């Protein structure tokens, strides 16, 4: 059983995946799971049940290293999930 803080990290992980999908950086969870050899069934189960003990910390590192997701945001919820994306949108605004 995951702690409440661990479940929050898991929820932010899935939120980051949704942002990446919405911004067309990834096509979806299948793209992510195939790239890193993650069992898609486990990922789908975890999304529905964040308290399950199947989350792998390496999944966070993939988001941080390969997609620029904020490690601080993933772990604490503070700041922006994708600061580079926020900065890009702000600079494009008139």
Name the predicted role of every residue range.
Residues 1-34:
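A short, Lys/Arg-rich alpha-helix, primarily the initiator
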Residues 49-65, 81:
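Short, basic-rich loop-to-helix N-cap that marks the start of a DNA-contacting helix
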């Amino acid at each position: 059983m995951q702690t409440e803080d661990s479940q929050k990290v898991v929820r932010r992980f899935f939120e980051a995946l949704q942002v990446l999908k919405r911004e067309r950086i990834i096509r979806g969870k299948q793209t992510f799971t195939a790239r890193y050899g993650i069992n898609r069934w486990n990922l789908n189960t975890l999304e529905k049940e964040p308290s399950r003990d199947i989350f792998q910390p390496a999944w966070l590192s993939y988001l941080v290293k390969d997609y620029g997701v904020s490690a601080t945001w993933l772990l604490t919820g503070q700041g922006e999930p994708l600061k580079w994306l926020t900065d890009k949108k702000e600079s494009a605004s008139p």
